[in-house]
A protein has these predicted regions:
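Active-site entrance/lid segments in N-terminal catalytic domains of soluble metabolic enzymes
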Residues: 1-166
Length: 167
């Protein structure tokens, strides 16, 4: 894949058309879960995205752990998100035991990898601890800094990378 990603970010990647365009261009592309606020909207957008993707092409789903309503609807109890190529867990990191159980469950459901989007040194370390518990599944870390006003982080990206890169 080209070295560029269309990361999930509400409101931009709530629309399946931009996600499909990037994915069909062979880029990592994420449908933003933050704007999928009802089961009907989520199902409509997933169906539209599926129709727009070329054969053999897939997209990832960006789920917001911080929002209990969306998390439960999309990933938790109702599990409305079908198999995507990956699930990106953002806006918070579950506790280690909960995260390991979730990763194993998603792996059993056919997700070939899981991504986390930590925005703090402590969160990066948490994701590394989670990854050590599930060596059979690739865990992707998408580190976010706080330059954009702290939406996902208040920490400087350079400091995050310097403090965690060697781990």
């Amino acid at each position: 894949r080209p070295p560029m990603m269309l990361a999930g970010m509400t409101p931009t990647t709530v629309d399946p058309a931009i996600v499909a365009a990037a994915a069909n261009g062979r880029h990592w592309a994420e449908l933003a879960g933050g704007g999928q606020v009802t089961p009907e909207l989520l199902e409509t957008h997933i169906a539209q995205l599926t129709d727009m993707l070329e054969p053999g092409i897939n997209a990832q789903f960006n789920s917001m752990f911080l929002d209990p309503y969306l998390w439960k609807m999309q990933i938790g109890g109702k599990r409305l998100v079908p198999k995507a190529r990956a699930n990106v867990i953002t806006a918070g990191i579950p506790e280690k035991d909960e995260a390991v159980a979730l990763v194993k469950e998603l792996m059993r459901d056919g997700f070939p990898w899981i991504a986390f989007k930590p925005g703090a040194i402590k969160q990066v370390n948490s994701v590394l601890a989670i990854a050590k518990e599930v060596p059979e599944l690739p865990i992707i870390i998408q580190i976010e800094g706080g330059v954009a006003g702290g939406h996902h982080s208040w920490e400087d990206l350079d400091e995050l990378l310097i403090a965690t890169y060697g781990k």
